[in-house]
């Protein structure tokens, strides 16, 4: 994908927010094409990297930034002050972004950006319980509400744990890990990230020469389940579709194959490349109005230079689309299915 020229930048004081350079930033800005006054919605504020770039793209770009994490909202206070009234921070889930911006008297938006998954800020804070590289409480909740990872690990049935690890974490040894978890918790509750990481490492052997920690996939699966991340992504795509004006653009950055599959199927169906099935008429595929046209013809990947500087970007993919004037069709049942645990179907190829 060719990179669009940068628009005039409205510089913000460097002290307004700790600098955080998000993944594929130049490519996201090019895909959005912020070439006019309007409202941008950053559905995943985090450390504020995309929001800062949106504000700097032009002096007449206004931003509503959303995050379910109250810590992120508090951390953005200086950036709000520096924005001169152009930034509003809203605590909530991006799956409700249409309702959240309507509550701000903004029924429509010109641009929406979603950066899916856990933020670097959350990973780096041991007390949040996301990282297997730092010991902390086994939490993983982005917003602090609902059951924690410790609740799942110590309370779910073995078969459910195995399904979570396999389908959300893509862990091939999911049954063995789930069995080890159940055996360990009979002796004592599993309460810290180090306990769980060590337990998984005793079951999943690292591949020779691989930099991937043996607990990576298990932690991913639990985190996705705790935060309903795939369900939130599905709701966010449909919410963005409802709020975008004709000509408005949606850019989505994903970090693993499950997320990317959902985004790919959404844009494929909504652009007319695939038939659409609705939950309201299950099993029936039919032509539907094309609510998006593709901006990116395939996934945009980070450059080698970016992955050298930021190894966490290596799995990132960007997809983007431009809203047409067609009304938003009913939600897609196909991507709703991808976001859920499938019904049990025998033992399959996992161990």
From Swiss-Prot:
Keywords annotated in UniProt: Cytoplasm, Methyltransferase, rRNA processing, S-adenosyl-L-methionine, Transferase
Coiled coil: none
Subcellular location: Cytoplasm
One cellular component term from this protein's GO annotations in UniProt: cytoplasm
Residues annotated to bind S-adenosyl-L-methionine: 48-50, 67, 94, 115, 122
Region (Disordered): 274-351
A single GO molecular function term of this UniProt record: rRNA (cytosine-N4-)-methyltransferase activity
UniProt keyword tRNA processing present: no
Single GO BP term: rRNA base methylation
Record EC number: 2.1.1.199
Record Pfam families: Methyltransf_5
HAMAP family, alphabetized: 16SrRNA_methyltr_H
Similarity-based family: Belongs to the methyltransferase superfamily. RsmH family.
Task performed by this protein: Specifically methylates the N4 position of cytidine in position 1402 (C1402) of 16S rRNA.
NCBIfam families listed in its UniProt record: 16S rRNA (cytosine(1402)-N(4))-methyltransferase RsmH (TIGR00006)
Protein name in UniProt: Ribosomal RNA small subunit methyltransferase H
């Amino acid at each position: 994908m060719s990179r669009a020229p940068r628009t005039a930048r409205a510089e913000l004081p460097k002290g307004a927010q700790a600098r955080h350079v998000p993944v594929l930033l130049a490519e996201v800005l090019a895909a959005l094409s912020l070439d006019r006054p309007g409202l941008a919605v950053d559905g995943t504020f985090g450390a504020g990297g995309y929001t800062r770039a949106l504000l700097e793209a032009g002096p007449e770009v206004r931003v509503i930034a959303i995050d379910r994490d109250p810590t992120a909202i508090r951390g953005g206070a200086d950036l709000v002050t520096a924005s001169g009234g152009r930034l509003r921070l809203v605590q909530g889930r991006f799956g409700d972004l249409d309702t959240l911006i309507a509550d701000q008297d903004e029924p429509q938006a010109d641009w929406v950006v979603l950066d899916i998954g856990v933020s670097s800020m959350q990973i780096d804070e041991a007390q949040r319980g996301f990282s297997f590289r730092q010991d902390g409480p086994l939490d993983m909740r982005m917003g602090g509400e609902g059951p924690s990872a410790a609740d799942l690990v110590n309370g779910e049935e073995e078969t459910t744990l195995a399904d979570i690890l396999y389908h959300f974490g893509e862990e091939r040894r999911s049954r063995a890990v789930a069995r080890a978890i159940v055996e360990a918790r009979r002796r004592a509750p599993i309460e810290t990230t180090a306990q769980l990481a060590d337990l998984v490492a005793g079951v999943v052997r690292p591949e020779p020469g691989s930099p991937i920690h043996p607990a990576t996939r298990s932690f991913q699966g639990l985190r996705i389940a705790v935060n309903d991340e795939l369900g939130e992504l599905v709701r966010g795509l449909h919410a963005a579709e409802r709020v975008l004006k004709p000509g408005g653009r949606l850019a989505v950055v994903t970090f693993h194959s499950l997320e990317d599959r959902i985004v790919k199927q959404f844009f494929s169906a909504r652009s007319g490349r695939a038939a659409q099935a609705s939950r309201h008429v299950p099993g029936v595929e039919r032509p539907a109005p094309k609510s998006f046209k593709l901006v990116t013809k395939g996934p945009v990947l980070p450059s080698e230079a970016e992955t050298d500087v930021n190894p966490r970007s290596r799995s990132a993919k960007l997809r983007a689309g431009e809203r047409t004037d067609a009304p938003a069709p009913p939600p897609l049942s196909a991507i709703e299915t991808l976001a859920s645990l499938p019904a049990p179907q025998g033992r399959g190829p996992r161990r």
